[in-house]
Every structure is written in C-alpha cells, then in structure tokens.
Regions:
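Histidine-acidic metal/acid-base catalytic patches
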Residues: 2-71, 145, 203-225, 229-314
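Short amphipathic alpha-helices and their capping/turn segments at secondary-structure boundaries
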Residues: 85-102, 133-143, 170-181, 238-243
Length: 314
C-alpha cells in the first residue's frame, strides 16, 4: 500500500467505491462470515471513520450504500481526503447520506502540496494562492457540511532560517483563518514524519504544531494528530496528546510499522482510545491506513481490530 497522503487521496478520488450491507451479498455458504460482520453492528464508543473504498471487496459502487454499510457496522463517521476532487453530485450525495444517518465527515484535504515551499514564504503571490485555495475549500465545505479542512504547510526552505519560516507560517495561517473562520470551518494542521514517508516537509511534530497553533491564536487553527506519523517522529503518544489537547481537533489512525489496522504494530491503541474517550472527545478519528490481510478476510479483520481496541472499560 502507498503510505503517502497522496496515495490515499488518489485512491479516494479514483476508486469512488462503495459498500453494501452484508445480507445483500453473502450467500448461505458464507453464513459464518455474515454473522461475524453482523456482530459489529453496535456503535463504537468513539467516532472511528473509514474512508470510501476501505471495504471495497464487499462493495458495489454506490456511495450511499457505502455509508449505510459503515453505519451498520457501528461506525458513526467517515472521511474522504479527496472529496474536493469529486464531482459536485458525488459530494452532495455523500453529504446527504451521512446526514440521513447522523454521521460525521472527518477532515477533507484542502491544501497539501508536498512538492513546493508555500506557507514558509513571505511572498504576496503565495498568500494570494493560499487565500484562493481557502475560498475554494469554503465552497466545498458548504456542499458537504464540512466542519474540518486539513492543511499541510508544505516543504521546508533550506535557504531560510527556521525561525523566519515559522513566523511566515504563522502569518499565512492567520490569513487562511480570515477566510475559514467566518464560514465556521476549522483548519487542522497535520504534522507528517520526515524519516520514512515525507522528507523535507516543514511540519513534523506535535509540539511544533502546538507552538504554531498557540501563536496563531485563532479558534479555526488546530491540529490533526496522526498517531502513525507521531509514533515515528516522537512517540510518547498519550503524554503528547495530553500536552497538546487544547489544540487537537481530529485524529488519524494507523499502526506502526506497516501503517495497517490496530494490533498489527507496536502501538497500544486500546489505551490510547481509552484516554481519548476519557477526555469526552466527540470528534472524528480517521482510519487512514491499510489492511494487513487481503480481500474480504482483511476487511472483516479491520472491523474486528477496532472492536478489540474499542473494548476498553469506561
């Protein structure tokens, strides 16, 4: 599986795959598998959010059926990184399907160009580009009832001191907030690891993102904490979540190594989820990872892995 953000966006935009409820496609010979999936129909304690296409081995192509299947499996949110690239009709269809079932939509990618320096620059043309992007994101958010928009501040400039770059990022984020805040949209900044997946990016650690959000000092500038990336960059996951709690608005999930479902790597998701739940968190946790097994078995295992990690005592 492509571990990069671009891989997830590309898959979401191209596949558009959807899911159907288990009884609609499983025959008598697969009764035991049907029962296993049906056992996951109780709602999860937290709003874990599959992406469109995550269960494509069980799927047709209807986006509404995709939403319904996830709801039947106990999920109360979904996410679609590439929803800005979908046709308007599909955007509206997703929004209506989620609204009908009372489900949330996690952060969509508004700006994440990994190939250029952008937020780190103090240039009028850069600012104009970012403002234009934010306005485009507002229009999409209106159609999809979007609450959160994901932003990656781009690459680090090797010819400019980091402190100057940080100041420029803060200024540019404030300009973005001027556009997003009146529309009720929260921009979430994502630190990404530079060791394995994204060398050269400016923002890579939760403490760094926290410092920037505190400096921007706007309610529309927060953090999406990607557990997979932060295990690689700094570890110490629960203490860092606790320290940055006031600035965290969303989570991304994935075990490490491998970036697959919980229990396939070194991260204790059950304890992490218990802590997040204890903070009365009502936001979305996007399942931005692959599956350790292929086919229908792998998809069933993903759901079961979340059942196991969600079985913490309250």
């Amino acid at each position: 599986m492509d571990n990069s953000r671009r891989g997830f966006i590309r898959k979401a935009a191209i596949s558009g795959t959807a899911l159907i409820a288990a009884p609609a496609f499983l025959g008598a010979s697969e009764k035991s598998k049907s029962n296993k999936l049906a056992a996951a129909e109780q709602p999860f304690k937290l709003k874990y959010a599959p992406y469109f296409g995550m269960f494509e081995e069980h799927a047709g192509k209807d986006l509404g059926d995709n939403v319904k299947f996830c709801h039947d499996m106990g999920f109360r949110a979904m996410f679609d990184n590439g929803i800005m690239n979908r046709p308007v009709d599909d955007q509206v269809k997703i929004a209506n399907a989620l609204q009908k079932l009372g489900m949330d939509l996690g952060p969509f990618v508004l700006y994440a160009d990994f190939s250029v320096t952008s937020f780190v620059l103090n240039k009028p043309e850069t600012r104009e580009m970012l403002i234009s992007k934010m306005k485009e994101g507002v229009e999409v958010a209106k159609r999809i009832n979007g609450k959160w928009a994901l932003v990656v501040p781009g690459r680090y400039d090797e010819r400019l001191h980091r402190e100057f770059q940080t100041a420029n990022v803060i200024d540019n984020l404030r300009y973005c907030c001027d556009i997003l805040e009146p529309a009720g949209i929260v921009m979430v900044l994502e630190p990404l690891n530079t060791l394995h997946d994204h060398p050269g990016l400016f923002l890579n650690r939760i403490p760094q993102a926290y410092e920037i959000c505190r400096a921007v000092n706007r309610p529309s500038c927060k953090i999406v904490d990607d557990i997979y990336h932060q295990q690689i960059t700094e570890g110490n996951l629960i203490p860092n979540i606790e320290a940055a709690w006031s600035e965290i608005a969303a989570f991304h999930l994935g075990d490490n190594p491998g970036r697959n479902e919980p229990s396939t790597g070194e991260i204790n998701f059950k304890n992490i989820f218990k802590y997040i739940y204890s903070r009365n968190y009502t936001g979305v946790l996007c399942m931005e990872h692959g599956s350790s097994l292929k086919g229908k078995e792998g998809e069933a295992r993903v759901i079961q892995a979340y059942r196991e990690a969600d079985s913490f005592e309250v």
